[in-house]
């Protein structure tokens, strides 16, 4: 059953259709990939889902309830969390405090400070950052800053997590660790919608993949179907 659905979602910037009449869905417990060349509209679609942008046309529903045009904080508290293409952490705050902010803000609004601290500590262990809990976020490696963003997003207690290029800029070992983290998140019962350019990763972790090109959905299917799609190959290789 879909946890997230979009119908005819459209967003223009001036005369440019960044996202054009796109339908999409993410089912409970699924990892769904979103791929496409740079400028295809992937991050714009995430911004529309999360409330950072408002569609010109179309509707977006979460758990059957329309969220089109709601403010980001309302969508977050309904159970949708995200990370960002460019890492956004509170640079001068310790790692633990970054996650605490998510715990205090999320779906269980009103959590006590003691419970929030316990939840933040658990999540740092979950993503592998327990050893650097007192380190300022600005002093982390890129890979660990990305893990911190994931932990902070998870601290809001989401049912759906949007991951925007979690693996960009990582070395092969870090990519493998990130793939394992996504699998663990799915095993926690959280649906994941992931933008990624690391094709080996996207083909390995996703149940289904959607392809955008010039703001339009041009293909959707299993990893095997996408990997063997002539349309997708032409978009990526220019044949």
Regions found by a protein language model. Give the residues of each.
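Glycine-rich phosphate-binding loops of nucleotide-dependent enzymes
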Residues: 1-239
